[in-house]
Every structure is written in structure tokens, then in C-alpha cells.
Amino acid sequence: MALEITPALSLLDEHHLLKEVVNEQKLTFENVTYDSRKVSDNTLFFCKGNFKPSYLTSALEKGATAYVSEQKYAEGMDATGIIVTNVQKAMALLGAAFYGFPQNELFIIAYTGTKGKTTSAYFAEHILAKATDKKVALFSTIDRVLGNEPDQRFKSDLTTPESLDLFHDMRAAVNNGMTHLVMEVSSQAYKKNRVYGLTFDVGVFLNISPDHIGRNEHPTFDDYLHCKEQLLVNSKRCVINGETAYLRDVYYTAKATTEPEDIYVFARKGAQISDNIPVDIEYQNDFEDLHKSVIEVKGLSDKAQTLHVDGKYELSVPGDYNEGNATSAIIATLLAGAKGEDARKTLDRVHIPGRMEIIKTKNNGTIYVDYAHNYASLKALFAFLKQQTHAGRVIAVLGSPGDKGISRRPGFGKAVSEEVDHVILTTDDPGFEDPMKIAQEIDSYINHDNVKVEFELDREIAIEKAIKMSTNNDIVVLAGKGEDPYQKIKGVDVPYPSDVNVAKKIVEEL
């Protein structure tokens, strides 16, 4: 790939980002990066984030010929300096241009929501894999799948990658023969302009509840909601969960840039929908247990009926809250050209790493491993499992990450108080915080009249305690980490076997 400086400057000027060019030269860039360790000859280097001038010095020594920044640097006096008003926006635009605008060669379904993004994205990816003969890429919190070969699947570092990485991966997916892409879009992706300039073919808004609010994330809930809603502003067609909080705000944000005939609202049958906003598609539970569920979906509006969505669908991922996730995936993929039969033949065999993973025992109940990590997702998970216990207990093992998401901790205590019988508070990516202080903070929000509370900071021992204390009718929930193979401690990813592997090993030894 290559990018000439003249069209690059024109693109920045078109978006009113270009302030000035220092030492302009006729250049062709053969590499783009924001990481000085990845610089090669003829690189366009981006000065972003926690930038130090020494990074620019290093980049120029390694072959960078120009830099993009919001200010001039003396260290770059011999190179071309492209000075912009917003380096994150500039990086997104020039990244797309460098990689040949790969988004134009993909049908893109994008998901946002406080909870359910990953599960919904996996549902949609499985349906499209059937519909397109496996020509679908997936960018999720768990995996980046760029093709069908083992070496084209990678673990994700961010829910939505930095823009240069995003467009690099899109180009790789196209080169690998992919025609469709399902991706998660976080609120931070809009906050930090990682998806600036992107228009999605279908944007799905699942839900919104207070989360990711704190010193390192969103300053207020209004800012969080605004960033979430930008997905709808930048989508050709919108799919909205009619049961979301702030539905009026969400719906009319979508309507500001999208014609009503291209907005599809779905909801559970009988749900109370605010402001008389019309529901296009409804779903209802036909069967559920601890291992699967069956939903019936029906199109109500004329536009919904043209999708031929009506029918029953069996889901291999249990949980009443996953029924709405599956419905959203069915609608989005039908808009992408799939058929209802594609969904019926795939939704009953979807496996999502770290989401409602079930481990059975002979005499110690059933173990569930789930990534649930905020009040909304924990409440939904615990409530569903409590309903299924048949007089047994719900025993939970959980903690809260350090350095971010501090506003989640009261919600953790609230969810535990409402649905859990016994909780062991433990370590979950404490970062630079004291894990005991985090656990004690969660504990301060727990109603001790309802819940027995223990502290065990060694997560493996906490899991062992929970499993060994459980009996046949009990359910053990290992929440928050899913299949994460590490603990983030003081800036280091410390290896950890994962909740799934720890639980399986303990069960084998019982």
C-alpha cells in the first residue's frame, strides 16, 4: 500500500483538519504508524496520545519522512510536518486512504450497547458465515477474525482497535476474500475518533446504562450516551432495541440522519415502549432451560414483513437476555442479505468464548463462566440463573477492575444483593489499585442481610472454594474475566490460566 502526500493533504483540508504544512516535500508514504518501534523507510508517523518528542526522534532515525501532529516539534525540523487540529481524526482519514478505503469493499454490521455487543456480534457472524460461505470477518472484544485460516485469527486488545489497526485489518480481511464484517464499536471508539469517517451499512443499538464513567473514560453519562448514539448517526440503516433506556433520545438521534423506513425497532412481545415509538419486530420465549432457549420472532410492520423474519429459532447460548441479542442479529443479517433459514441452522450451535460457558459437575452443581462486568449484565445473568436454580443457591465469584470503571462498583454490590446468596470477592485486573480495597468497596454496597460475603484475593483459591461449597442444586457463577489468560497487575499482564481452565481442573480433581 502507498499514499502520496498531495491527496493526503487534500483529504485533511476537505475535513477542515489541516492547519499548516512545515517543510513540504513531494513524498510517497509506504508505511503509516503511531508506534516508533514499527517505523520503516518512507513512514508517515502520527504523534498521538501520551506522546514524547523522543518518539519522533526515534521515528525519523528509522526512516520516517513526515509526521502528523497537533503542534510543531523542533525534533522534526528536517522532516515534513503536517499540523492538524485533531490528530486522531487525521489518523483515521489517512489510515483509510493508505489502505485503499477497504470499508467500501465490505458490508459492515456494527454493534454498540452497554451489554450484549460480543454475544450479538458472534450470533451475527455465525449467521453470515452460513449465508456467505464463510466470507465474514469479525472484530470483537474477544477476537479479530480476518479470514478462515488459523493464522488469520488474533486475540483482541481493544473492543474497537486504533484507526490505523482497524483499517489495516479491514484491508487484510478483504485480501483474504471476506465480503462482510461484523464489528463491535465501543463508546471510546467515538470518544477517541477511532472510527471517524466510517459509515456502517447496519448499525445496531442494544441498550444503555451507566458504565465506563470515570476519570479515564467518560466524564458524564450524557457524554457516554452521546458517544454511543454516534453509531446510529453514521449508519445507513439502524436496528434499535425498543426496550433500551433513553429510547426517545436514541430513536430520534437515528431519525435525524436516517429515513424512518430504514430504522427497525424490535422488542419482546408485550413490552411497554415509550413515546408510542412503533415496534417493527417482536419476539417471545417459547422454551428455556439452563442450556438453551427457543424464541419466536414475528414481523409487525410492512417493512419488517419483507425481511421474512417470522419463525422459531433455537439458541445454544442460554439466558432470557440473550434472546434480544439473537433477535438483533437475525434482523441485522437479514438486512445484509441472509435468510431466516441461515439463522435457524446456526444459532443452535454458536459458542462464544467466556460467555455463558457451562461446566457440569457430578455433585457440586453447575458452573457458569461469563464476562459480565457491569450492573446491567450481572443483574441479567444472576436473575436468569436464580430463576433456574430450583431452590438451590447462586454462589458468585467476582471482583472489579482497577484504574477504570470505578462507577461500576456500587452496581456490583447492588446486583449481588438482589440475586446472589453467597459471594466470594476476589481479584479482577486490579491494575495499580489495592485489590483488597476494591473488594471492600464492593462489599460496602452489599446488603449483608441477603448475602453471605467472603474475601479471597487469590482468584484460583476463590474459585476452588466456591465449587467445593456448592451442592447439586446450586449454581456457581465465575463473573468478569471469561477466558482472559492474564491478570492486569501494576502495568503487567500476569499470566493466569483463565476461569474456564481453573474450574475444569478443579472439577477433574473432585
Curated annotation (Swiss-Prot):
Please give an example of a GO cellular component term from this record. cytoplasm
Q: Which residues carry this modification: N6-carboxylysine?
A: K228
- Protein's pathway: Cell wall biogenesis; peptidoglycan biosynthesis
Q: Does the keyword ATP-binding apply?
A: yes
Cite the binding residues for UDP-N-acetyl-alpha-D-muramoyl-L-alanyl-D-glutamate: S36, T159, T160, S186, R194
One GO term of the biological process aspect: cell division
GO MF term list? acid-amino acid ligase activity; ATP binding; magnesium ion binding
Q: Which keywords does the record carry?
A: ATP-binding, Cell cycle, Cell division, Cell shape, Cell wall biogenesis/degradation, Cytoplasm, Ligase, Nucleotide-binding, Peptidoglycan synthesis
> What InterPro entries does UniProt report for this protein, alphabetically?
Mur-like_cat_sf, Mur_ligase_C, Mur_ligase_C_dom_sf, Mur_ligase_cen, MurE/MurF_N, UDP-N-AcMur-Glu-dNH2Pim_ligase
The residues listed in the UniProt record as binding ATP, with positions renumbered to this chain, are: G113, T114, K115, G116, K117, T118, T119
UniProt key word Mitochondrion: no
Top-rank lineage group of the source organism = Bacteria
Give the protein's biological function: Catalyzes the addition of an amino acid to the nucleotide precursor UDP-N-acetylmuramoyl-L-alanyl-D-glutamate (UMAG) in the biosynthesis of bacterial cell-wall peptidoglycan.
The protein's matches in NCBIfam families, at most eight in alphabetical order, are given as: murE (TIGR01085), PRK00139.2-4 (NF001130)
Protein family membership: Belongs to the MurCDEF family. MurE subfamily.
Q: What is this protein called?
A: UDP-N-acetylmuramyl-tripeptide synthetase
Q: Which organism is it from?
A: Ligilactobacillus salivarius (strain UCC118)
Upper taxonomic classification of the species? Bacteria, Bacillati, Bacillota, Bacilli, Lactobacillales
